[in-house]
Amino acid sequence: MIPGEIITPDGEIELNAGRNTVKLSVANAGDRPIQVGSHFHFYEVNHGLIFDRELALGMRLDIPAGTAVRFEPGDEKEVTLVPLVGSREVYGFNGRVNGEINAEGRGG
């Protein structure tokens, strides 16, 4: 074994298996590209992105950690979101929640 080595079982690993997901159509109405990282609270992304924000409360992109989705000006694409897990407390980002998100997705 090499220090830091991760040994995984054979086969494919399914990310976020069994978690509820939401699909949203997202459009970039701005004049510059907008990139959103894998663990950014999607509800709080740049307001140049147009979508149903209430559905995104407490959610993040369903993509591998460390990756991102880029929206070019005028782009519209469908994204899949998964719930934030753990304590379901959201602090920072754009400061729109700064607290707990309850089971219904509403700020606490």
UniProtKB/Swiss-Prot annotation:
Pathway: Nitrogen metabolism; urea degradation; CO(2) and NH(3) from urea (urease route): step 1/1. Keywords: Cytoplasm, Hydrolase. GO terms for biological process: urea catabolic process. It is an enzyme of class 3 (hydrolase). Heterotrimer of UreA (gamma), UreB (beta) and UreC (alpha) subunits. Three heterotrimers associate to form the active enzyme. Belongs to the urease beta subunit family. One of its GO terms (cellular component) is urease complex. NCBIfam families: PRK13203.1 (NF009682), urease_beta (TIGR00192). This is Urease subunit beta. Gene3D superfamilies: Urease, beta subunit (2.10.150.10). It comes from Trichormus variabilis (strain ATCC 29413 / PCC 7937). HAMAP family: Urease_beta. GO terms for molecular function: urease activity. It is found in: Cytoplasm.
